[in-house]
Swiss-Prot record:
Residues 144-209 form the HTH luxR-type domain. SMART domains: HTH_LUXR, REC. Interacts with RcsD and RcsA. It comes from Salmonella typhimurium (strain LT2 / SGSC1412 / ATCC 700720). CDD domains: LuxR_C_like (cd06170), REC_NarL-like (cd17535). PROSITE patterns: HTH_LUXR_1, HTH_LUXR_2, RESPONSE_REGULATORY. GO terms for biological process: phosphorelay signal transduction system; regulation of DNA-templated transcription. Gene3D superfamilies: 3.40.50.2300, Winged helix-like DNA-binding domain superfamily/Winged helix DNA-binding domain (1.10.10.10). Keywords: DNA-binding, Phosphoprotein, Transcription, Transcription regulation, Two-component regulatory system. GO terms for molecular function: DNA binding. This is Transcriptional regulatory protein RcsB. Phosphorylated and activated by RcsD. PANTHER family: TRANSCRIPTIONAL REGULATORY PROTEIN RCSB (PTHR43214:SF17), TWO-COMPONENT RESPONSE REGULATOR (PTHR43214).
């Protein structure tokens, strides 16, 4: 791959602007599209000659959803498109499930400014990229004794939305699954993580994210 055509997707215009300005400093990168929701992204993908999609994990879009659901749809319908996830979500269980989707990289928005250019440079060489900030988080969940109890992508998606404040009924509607299915996936995830109630689950999700000292 010589010049790299990139699409950016994020529901915050200022983030789109910042990413584009950052990528404009890389002479071999061309930004060929910017989208603020998943529906616009999917509708325009067939029209664009893109090599890489840089997408937020949490992004509105009624028809195609976001997160793991969106990534799986894109990989199924646009298999040649490389995907780099850019996210504020630093929960290791969720990040691990996203990486299990065989994406090309994941970058934290609160990570080093050089992480995204490094991810693209690695991709240009045919390699995947996991920044140190993400590697530290994945080590954290292993240290907590949950390394052999990996969440499924569907379980991780339910926990991501639960951590964002969605109720089980709202998650069911958003993911187009039954309330019974969502409840079962949430319960299964809680059993794997060794937590018995919602408060303990929220405490766990909070405890395994980066603390201020982790960011130094």
């Amino acid at each position: 791959m010589n010049n790299m055509n990139v699409i950016i997707a994020d529901d915050h215009p200022i983030v789109l602007f910042g990413i584009r300005k950052s990528l404009e400093q890389i002479e071999w990168v061309n930004v060929v599209g910017e989208f603020e929701d998943s529906t616009a992204l999917i509708n325009n993908l067939p029209k664009l000659d893109a090599h890489v999609l840089i997408t937020d994990l949490s992004m509105p879009g009624d028809k195609y959803g976001d997160g793991i659901t969106l990534i799986k749809y894109i990989k199924r319908h646009f298999p040649s498109l490389s995907i780099i996830v850019l996210t504020m979500n630093n929960n290791p269980a969720i990040l691990s499930a996203v990486l299990d989707l065989d994406i090309e990289g994941i970058v934290l928005k609160q990570g080093a400014p050089t992480d995204l250019p490094k991810a693209l440079a690695a991709l240009q060489k045919g390699k995947k990229f996991t920044p140190e900030s993400v590697s530290r988080l994945l080590e954290k969940i292993s240290a907590g004794g949950y390394g052999d109890k990996r969440l499924s992508p569907k379980e991780s998606e339910v926990l991501r939305l639960f951590a964002e404040g969605f109720l089980v009924t709202e998650i069911a509607k958003k993911l187009n699954r039954s309330i019974k299915t969502i409840s079962s996936q949430k319960k299964s995830a809680m059993m794997k993580l060794g937590v018995e109630n919602d408060i303990a689950l929220l405490n766990y999700l909070s405890s395994v994210t980066l603390s201020p000292t982790d960011k130094e």
